[in-house]
Amino acid sequence: MLEIGKVERYIHEKLKKEKLHFVLLDPDDVSPETAGKIAEMSEAIGVDAIMVGGSTGAEGEVLDSVVRAIKESSSLPVILFPGSHGGISRYADAIFFMSLLNSRNPFFITGSQALGAFTVKRYGIEPIPMAYLIIEPGETVGWVGDAKPIPRHKPKIAAAYALAGQYLGMRLVYLEAGSGAPQPVPPEMIALVRKVIDVPLIVGGGIRTKEQARRAVEAGADIIVTGTAVEKAGSIEKARKKLEELNSGVKI
């Protein structure tokens, strides 16, 4: 029988009490040492999990060394956020096993997933099925994933895809504006998606300020993902201040 894994249970239990904040680290952009420091800092500030991955598909020792450094520096769950089937590390706690539902290319809907499935099973990583939706502008992930980005002013399209994802068995829905996007996902879109689905809703991309994080949470996001704003802070101390600011917007 299928059983929900430890990390997914952790997410659901925490969501009964508060909204969650996940920090995304891209192994292409951060060294293992920096990743470890950010993870340690994140745990002290009250972040709930660390996601590791990126659009350009860091893999192998580059990925493994970052995951190991995070595991050695904090007790937060480490969840893989792979750009392809190569983005799997045996050292992670879980993987967002996601389908890019609005891709034009079936490889990103089911093909890459099929290629990675046995690796996930062999490593014993907890898979968490997730519907992944790219919202305009989409940035690098939209280009790499050959997505047809959902227009920002068409929340009903996002809601239809999100509900389809839930009905297909996905246990999370992620609305993604793209790392470093000039604007985050519109609150109106978040609100409509939240209204029609019953599974947790993740929102990421373009969230740089406490106010933007708060607006997303107030609109209905259950989990906020930040990354670029922290990675590009310029120093560890600046990263700490940015993390504290963003976290205060989520934990309202």
UniProtKB/Swiss-Prot annotation:
Q: Which residues bind Mg(2+)?
A: 26, 55
Give the EC number(s) listed in the UniProt record. Answer: 2.5.1.41
**Compartments, record wording:** Cytoplasm
Question: Which CDD domains would you find in this protein's record?
Answer: PcrB_like
Q: Does the keyword Magnesium apply?
A: yes
**Predominant cellular place of this UniProt entry's protein:** cytoplasm
Cross-referenced Pfam families: PcrB (PF01884)
Record field: catalytic activity: sn-glycerol 1-phosphate + (2E,6E,10E)-geranylgeranyl diphosphate = sn-3-O-(geranylgeranyl)glycerol 1-phosphate + diphosphate
GO cellular component annotations of the record: cytoplasm
Q: Which GO terms describe its molecular function?
A: imidazoleglycerol-phosphate synthase activity; magnesium ion binding; phosphoglycerol geranylgeranyltransferase activity
Cofactor(s) this protein requires: Mg(2+)
Q: Does the keyword Lipid biosynthesis apply?
A: yes
What keywords is this UniProt entry annotated with?
Cytoplasm, Lipid biosynthesis, Lipid metabolism, Magnesium, Metal-binding, Phospholipid biosynthesis, Phospholipid metabolism, Transferase
Q: What is the enzyme's class at the highest EC level?
A: transferase
Q: Which residues bind sn-glycerol 1-phosphate?
A: 174-180, 205-206, 227-228
Q: What pathway does the UniProt record associate with this protein?
A: Membrane lipid metabolism; glycerophospholipid metabolism
Q: In Gene Ontology terms, what is a biological process of this protein? A: glycerophospholipid biosynthetic process
Concerning InterPro entries, the annotation shows: GGGP/HepGP_synthase_sf, GGGP_HepGP_synthase, GGGP_synth, IGPS_HisA/HisF
Q: Organism's domain of life?
A: Archaea
**Hey, which family's this protein in?**
Belongs to the GGGP/HepGP synthase family. Group II subfamily.
Q: Which HAMAP family match?
A: GGGP_HepGP_synthase
* Protein role: Prenyltransferase that catalyzes the transfer of the geranylgeranyl moiety of geranylgeranyl diphosphate (GGPP) to the C3 hydroxyl of sn-glycerol-1-phosphate (G1P). This reaction is the first ether-bond-formation step in the biosynthesis of archaeal membrane lipids.
Quote the protein name from its UniProt record.
Answer: Geranylgeranylglyceryl phosphate synthase
